[in-house]
Every structure is written in structure tokens, then in C-alpha cells.
Amino acid sequence: MTAENQQNNVTLGALCMCAAMIAGTSIDISVKALAPTYSTAQIVFLRSAIALPLVLALVWHRVGLSALSTAGWGWQLWRGLLTAGASFGFFYGLIYIPLVTALMLAYVGPVLIVLLARPLLGEHISPGRLVGVMLGFAGVVFVISPGSLTIEPAIWSILGSALCWALLSISNRQLATKVSTPVLTFYTYPVSLVIAAVWTWGAWITPAPMDWLLFSVTALGSALAHGFAALAYRYAAAGVVAPFEYTALIWISLAGFLFWGEVPAWTVWVGGSAVILGGIVALRG
């Protein structure tokens, strides 16, 4: 691969991760709106139930249904469990923690990816890229006022979700050259669907008409987020694209202002600038 092609792949990987974060923001907004009424399990169940046939149609159109049988069952079960852990953990946390704060806690994920990429993938993490990730993480820490958080189950739930997401991202990188993106995306849903169905049994609340729209947004946003994230790790190393998960801060801040009238504090803008700078450093590192 020429240096120019390699740089193009890095750029595509970064853009795909940015797109994944935009899609992910739509999920967070919808879940935050649904959480006061519906259980975490029902949200995960309907998200998975709506998304699964959409992604199945994409698999049929792009690579054929036969590709599902060659995806590596052990890996896909592992990825399904990680997806369930990430979904349940983050959605539960959103019930008790403000949206932006939950996102800040979840931002430990990219740092975990960099730390895990070397032992699990054997990827070389250059000093420049490591500095970029740490700079981005420092920006996230700056946004959170010291002493503003207390140790509670919801916080541990978000942090556990971040660990699951980091391991899922690592597995995406491991399988990206072996399994097509539609197939990778498809197998993120069945395990969550089964677990959520069992958990929802006997506690079902029939959604209001407008809430069906929000559930549909969580499904479509989830499919797009998983798809773009898988593409990102296909194009570039985990240590390169991970910092671009921080760009979700921009969209979450805008959503908070547009939908809830929230005006981010100056610390958000300063920390956000550090996050963006960290992404640039990682890209060039």
C-alpha cells in the first residue's frame, strides 16, 4: 500500500468514526427521552427488534445470507455479549445521570482501546498517537467539575459499558478484514434481543404512537453507529480512530441546547477544544 493510499484510509477511518458518533448521539437523545417511561430492557428489546430485519435486508443485498454462516460463531457470540453489556450499561446510566455527564464517563472507552490494542491486537501505538488520546481524555476530565460525581451504581454501569464498547471495538478490528461490515453489524443484535426479551417478560408497556418514532430512531441510529464503527476499524488502526469518538461531545452539546435549552459551561468548550486537538494529534502521530 502506498503512503498516499494509507493516508486516505486513515482519513476514511476517521470520517467513519465521526459518522458513527453522530448516529450514536441520536440514540442517546432518544433513550434519554424514553427512559422515564420504559425499562432499559424494553428499550434494548425494541431497538434490537426493529434494527435486526433492517440489517438482515442489508446483508442479503450486499453479501448474501450465506455470509452469515461463515462469520465465526464464537467471535459473534462474544461480540453480542459485549454489545448487550454496552447497551444495558449505558441506557441504565442515562436514567440517573445527565446526558453530557454520562457521555464524559463513557469517554474512558477510547483510552481503554489504546491500552488494549497492543496486547490484544499487537498494534504499535506511537508516542504521538498516545499523546493525542491522553490529551483528548484530559479534555474530557476538564469538563467534569471535581467532586461533582458520587460513586453510585449508575456511574459504574456507564464505566462498565465503556469497557464493553472498548472490547467490542477491538473485536471489530480483529474481524474487519475477515467478515463484511453488514455481517458484523447484524451479529451485534441477536444476543441483546434474547436477553432483553427475557428481562422484559411481564413488564411490557405498550409504546405511545410518538414513542414508536423514538424507538425507530434508536434502531436506525444503532445500525448506522455499529456499521460506521466497523468500517472505521477496517480502514485504520484502533489507536488512530479511537480519539474521534470524542467528537460526539459536539453533537451532544448541540442536542442539549436544542432539545432541553442547556447551555454548556465554558469548561465544555475548553475541554472540547482539547478533545479535538487530541484527535488531530492522533491522526498525525
Please describe what each predicted stretch is.
Residues 11-19, 59-60, 64-89, 153-161, ...:
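Loop-to-transmembrane-helix transition segments
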Residues 12-13, 37-85, 164-168, 187-202:
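Transmembrane alpha-helices of multi-pass small-molecule transport proteins
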Residues 21-26, 56, 80-88, 110-115, ...:
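Hydrophobic/small/kink-forming positions within alpha-helical transmembrane segments
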Residues 29-32, 40, 55, 147-207, ...:
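Transmembrane alpha-helical segments that form core, pore/gating elements
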Residues 39-51, 92-109, 151-164, 208-222, ...:
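Structural signature of hydrophobic alpha-helical transmembrane segments
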Residues 46, 102-108, 175-191, 226-257, ...:
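Helix-helix packing/entry segments at the starts of transmembrane helices
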Residues 92, 109-131, 250-270:
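C-terminal transmembrane-helix exit sites in multi-pass transporters
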Residues 128-144, 267-284:
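Hydrophobic transmembrane alpha-helices of multi-pass small-molecule transport proteins
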